Amino acid sequence: MSGLVLGQRDEPAGHRLSQEEILGSTKVVSQGLEALHSEHQAVLQSLSHTIECLQQGGHEEGLVHEKARQLRRSMENIELGLSEAQVMLALASHLSTVESEKQKLRAQVRRLCQENQWLRDELAGTQQRLQRSEQAVAQLEEEKKHLEFLRQLRQYDEDGHGMEEKEGEATKDSLDDLFPNEEEEDSGNDLSRGQGAAAAQQGGYEIPARLRTLHNLVIQYAAQGRYEVAVPLCKQALEDLERTSGRGHPDVATMLNILALVYRDQNKYKEAAHLLNDALSIRESTLGRDHPAVAATLNNLAVLYGKRGKYKEAEPLCQRALEIREKVLGTDHPDVAKQLNNLALLCQNQGKYEAVERYYQRALAIYESQLGPDNPNVARTKNNLASCYLKQGKYSEAEALYKEILTCAHVQEFGSVDDDHKPIWMHAEEREEMSRSRPRDSSAPYAEYGGWYKACRVSSPTVNTTLKNLGALYRRQGKLEAAETLEECALRSRKQGTDPISQTKVAELLGEGDGRKAIQEGPGDSVKFEGGEDASVAVEWSGDGSGTLQRSGSLGKIRDVLRRSSELLVRKLQGTEPRPSSSSMKRAASLNYLNQPNAAPLQVSRGLSASTVDLSSSS
């Protein structure tokens, strides 16, 4: 057994045993030592028995004792070897356990490294997104500041329409240029008898009641944006008229005008122009070249060309319409003044400022002589003429007109101009002089600087825009305090215009809501040819200096027309007698639907005023 152990120890020194080989050899040695221990144990027992026998006989006792001692030492060595082998086996088992734990820890370390890399990637992506977001926020803030600056620039030349603007009054070209307005509905049967008789005397014709009903019905459908119903309705009526009355009948021309209007509201300008040209040919052949209906169609065709930016083509049409109205109505009729305003607009878009001044001055003279100096058309025409002066650099003439407008509005409000009641521009100039003598304390009450703020009660779209335009003119002249006064007054006027009381006062001041005055002064919003068809001059200055194409009437008239015509239509369909109009009958939708957000903008518009151009160039 000992030889086996020695043989294993004599293996070549250069051969390194693996851990498994060491463990196997240790187990073999341990087994050999156990066997050797058992063998020595048996020999020791035999010697002990021999010693007992020798003690009885007394021979060779010392030799036996010596062998026993050697055996005991050998057994002690064997037991020590066994203990060491057991320790080695236990150590090997512990090392195996430690190695297993080590592998587990390594696996965990690998997973943690992967998770750490994932977290780093996620953090890097989040940081990039955060950086992009911060850049976007900074860019949006810059764009916001830029837009706010542009908005402030536009305030010097924007179109201030107060509450009417919110209700849709600022539509570029409303339906009233082809359809009957409030005056026709108010007159009722008197219209068909009076105007019909006049039409008969002058060789005109009277529009049948069925076409009037169709007018109002198409208005309702168009107001609701239901063109898919309005267009087939017009086409069917047109086919019926052509079949029963013939292609050259005036009623066919009327229906062509209605269908052209619907196409125009859909931005189908080519189709609308084709229909209006057909209507013009029919009316010229049936009613004569100098009939008011021909002038109405010419005006509507000029409107269409103006929308497309064809000012040169529109100007001769508008000029011919003016000649017809001068011949039929006289050179001093208010409707001639409206046509002059339209012609001035077309000329201004072509840069013909001398002609623009001539047309505006003539229109202003007609309004003042026929309607009086307090008529709102006078203020609007003065404002338009002042804007024309601004575009030519005639600042003194423009300033004088602006002051006339504000003074007239002030007189209508307070009755006179005295020390206690001064127009707002006088207060502005006084504050300018005071600011030059001593700086104004921003916290001081307004009473210290006079009652200028009381003049802010004078409010209308025309006056409001005049305040802003005159304020811009003051800024050009370096009168900053005066400009701020007018701008603040314009802001107050705009805020006051949002309540019904202020709106009523504005209507009373400028006569925009006075029906009796409109009847006495003549048609202020439209020109109707004999027979009752409306041929209003829809394209004219808005009266605020913006130079946009806009109808000068009020949407309240359209609402009343729609309300009454709707009730009449319902009564006719039900076969009952018409009753007085009920206040509960309302129009189905607002005319704002006609100005769709994606609709092409009106091209016939004025450029910015000179003050705004300078502000834009300086920025």
From Swiss-Prot:
InterPro entries: Kinesin_light, Kinesin_light_repeat, TPR-like_helical_dom_sf, TPR_rpt. The gene is Klc4. This is Kinesin light chain 4. It comes from the Eukaryota. Residues 156-199, 571-619 are annotated as: Disordered. The modification N-acetylserine is found at residue 2. One of its GO terms (cellular component) is cytoplasm. Kinesin is a microtubule-associated force-producing protein that may play a role in organelle transport. The light chain may function in coupling of cargo to the heavy chain or in the modulation of its ATPase activity. TPR repeats lie at residues 55-88, 211-244, 253-286, 295-328, 337-370, 379-412, 464-497. Belongs to the kinesin light chain family.
